[in-house]
A protein has these predicted regions:
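Extended acidic/polar, glycine-enriched regions
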Residues: 147-217, 224-286
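Loop/helix patches that line or flank the sugar-binding groove of alpha-linked glycan CAZymes
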Residues: 353, 560-570, 576-660
Length: 660
């Protein structure tokens, strides 16, 4: 026996069902007791009254629920009361998402990105899909129509953007309008029954074979009339007129069936179906979280230099006269001339004296050795103070102002560690770990030892440390810093960074964070989840064709929605054998790969001068600038050609259509 086709029967609306009052056991018992306590005559009278009342109600209900035709009756919306429930239309497998929506995927303001989902409905009924962009409060801001790109897999896609792109910089006067668009957003994929397309498909066949034509055309006219009245479709008065005029033509029996059908196949109605469709049985997915960051937050070209080496020279006595923030203006101008847009400084805080390191990380410092800027803190101050050897806070603010005039951002290295002389050691001794002999433990990464650095112990007062770091970062942001490059964040609790970054970006949503974390993939991913916009990575050690192909695919794949790898050919701590052994050609090759292989790349100054001598036994530069002041001859860059190449690479990047 053939299965009965219920879909061929007239539908009745299910959108406004009468509310059903729940009956508890207690109320049922009370009603029963009340009924049994009545006398027989009273019960009989009550029964007659109840029967009459029921009959009247049933009669009224039957009149209200008169059968509706296919064109008149919308598919009902089925409310979802828990995340795992399906609606009337099924929505699955939304991308992009991060850990099934637990963490936000990251996109730039106004950046176009692809949203995909599986959207389907039972039987041969046609489905439609829309992407709804909503603000943090859940209010819809914009809709994007989705296209079915793989009917066999019910796969739908749409190019979506959140907010409007802007070329304004964080220091520009009108930047407040950009800041308001940054932060948490939601994307919801809405599936719906495409009643129009389902009807049109069948009606075209029926008109062609002359089968039940009048019913088909009448249903279409009713459908158009209902579409014109649908508030969800957000139609203009002109749009409604188009639909209603087509409905009248459909009802005009003086025309041929083909002419009547043609009225609903016009380009105007096809366009309305694309932009303002009739969406029956609307079903929303669970909201997908997105974090919108400022333009070029992941498209960046970094340039690193040490202020104490900028403008340094040999005095008449043969000793080096170090540079400072004022002489470092020359470094800003060089970075801008080469086309970079971020200047990254190492820590510029006072350097400790106790256990100060000498040249090449030697244990004993000479009388003229400046120490490592990563040995932070002295009696002159800590992380909230400018090293007097470099200048004052006013000098730093002037430095930032000049950078901004040149279109450059300032990124400041934030190394959360202390020298033995840091004010925190006395003010907060519980922030440090002590050995059994009572001394504070210095930093170690066996076999490496850092006697000039005390690591922070987060187990005693993490909340207090968080508040202090938030205060310090706020101070530097107000001075002109827009990016923090965090040193070794993977050696601190992820939750610590989650709290700090959330607090800082709540107040300053334009601020970005880069993780200098050479660590395991899980830790790198977790740091990205909690707000590190960019990350150092293992690009310097990817040299073969196979290694590069694999790494480029990884860097530019879906992982880019949470982790943005920044490619650096060298750093003060990284000088690979490839760069060491291949001279100018090697420097050129690695620069091209870095600039073209990732949206974000960086150069450590001196690259233009082919500084490629390794410290014996280490993959780092000899005479490391972390431990001494370097005097460089910048007039000699022309003979190498690397500075010109860097300039060309940045120009190619900035003028490429993919540049945001």
């Amino acid at each position: 026996m053939a299965e009965e086709d219920k879909s061929a029967e007239p539908r009745t609306t299910a959108t406004k069902q009468p509310a059903v009052k729940k009956t508890t056991a207690k109320s049922a018992a009370a009603k029963t007791a009340s009924a049994t306590s009545q006398t027989p005559s009273k019960r009989t009278a009550a029964a007659k009254k109840s029967t009459a009342s029921t009959a009247r109600k049933r009669t009224t209900k039957a009149k209200a629920a008169a059968p509706q035709t296919v064109g008149e009756a919308p598919a009902p919306v089925i409310e979802r009361t828990s995340p795992e429930q399906f609606g009337r239309v099924n929505v699955l497998d939304i991308t992009p998402n991060v850990e099934n929506g637990l963490f936000p995927a990251r996109v730039e303001l106004g950046e176009a990105f692809n949203v995909t989902a599986q959207v389907f409905i039972e039987g041969r009924t046609k489905a439609g899909a829309t992407v709804s962009v909503r603000n943090a409060r859940g209010r819809e801001v914009e809709r994007f129509a989705m296209t079915c790109t793989n009917p066999g897999l019910d796969r739908w896609e749409a190019m979506v953007k959140i907010g409007e792109h802007s070329d304004l910089k964080p220091w520009d006067a009108d930047y407040a309008a950009v800041k308001r668009q940054l932060g948490e957003w939601q994307i919801v994929v809405e599936g719906w029954e495409d009643t129009y397309q389902s009807w049109l498909h069948d009606a075209a066949i029926k008109v062609k074979v002359n089968d039940d034509v009048e019913n088909a055309l009448e249903s279409g006219a009713q459908l158009l009339a209902r579409w014109a009245d649908a508030k969800d479709s957000k139609l203009s008065a002109a749009d409604k007129k188009v639909l209603r005029d087509a409905a009248k033509t459909m009802e005009n029996k003086s025309l041929s069936a083909e002419e009547r059908l043609a009225a609903v196949q016009s380009s105007d109605i096809e366009q309305l179906h694309e932009t303002n469709p009739l969406r029956d049985g609307l079903s929303e997915s669970n909201p997908q979280r997105f974090r919108v960051e400022r333009p070029k937050s992941s498209f960046a070209s970094w340039y690193q230099f040490f202020p104490r080496s900028e403008g340094a020279y040999y005095g008449e006595d043969g000793k080096i006269v170090p540079g400072n923030l004022k002489t470092s203006i020359a470094g800003l101008e060089r970075a801008a001339a080469e086309g970079f847009n971020i200047v990254y400084l190492p820590p510029i805080f006072p350097i400790g004296v106790t256990n100060r390191k000498g040249r090449n990380n030697s244990l004993v410092a000479g009388p003229n050795d400046p120490g490592s800027p990563f040995g932070i803190g002295s009696e002159l101050g800590g992380h909230d103070t400018v090293d007097p050897q470099l200048g004052t806070m006013d000098d730093f603010k002037a430095f930032c102002e000049r950078a901004h005039e040149l279109g450059l951002e300032i990124a400041l290295d934030f190394a959360l560690q202390c020298s033995p002389d840091h004010p925190w050691v006395k003010a907060h001794p519980n922030w440090f770990r002590t050995k059994p002999d009572g001394t504070i433990a210095f930093a170690e990464n066996p076999p490496k030892k850092y006697q000039d650095i005390y690591p922070i112990d987060f187990n005693a007062d993490m909340e207090g440390i968080e508040k202090e770091v938030e205060r310090i970062m706020d101070l530097w942001v107000k001075a002109g810093v827009t990016i923090f490059r965090v040193d070794n964040p993977h050696t601190k609790p992820v939750r610590f960074w989650q709290d700090v970054i959330a607090a800082v970006t709540k107040k300053h949503p334009e601020v970005l964070f880069l993780a200098e974390a050479f660590t395991r993939p899980g830790m790198m991913r977790a740091l990205s989840y909690v707000g590190f916009t960019q990350s150092h990575c293992y690009f310097p050690w990817r040299n073969t064709k196979e290694e590069l192909e694999e790494y480029l695919e990884e860097t530019n794949g879906n992982g880019g929605f949470y982790q943005h790898n920044t490619f650096w050919p060298t750093t003060p701590d990284i000088l690979t054998a490839y760069v060491r052994d291949n001279g100018i050609a090697g420097h050129a090759v690695r620069a091209v790969l870095a600039a073209m292989g990732s949206p974000s790349w960086g150069i450590y100054n001196g690259y233009e001068l082919i500084e490629n001598k390794q410290r014996p036994g280490f993959e780092e530069q000899i005479d490391n600038e972390k431990y001494e002041v370097k005097v460089r001859d910048w007039d000699s860059t022309e003979k190498y050609g690397i500075a010109e190449l860097l300039t060309s690479l940045n120009k190619i990047r900035d003028t490429h259509p993919a540049c945001p």
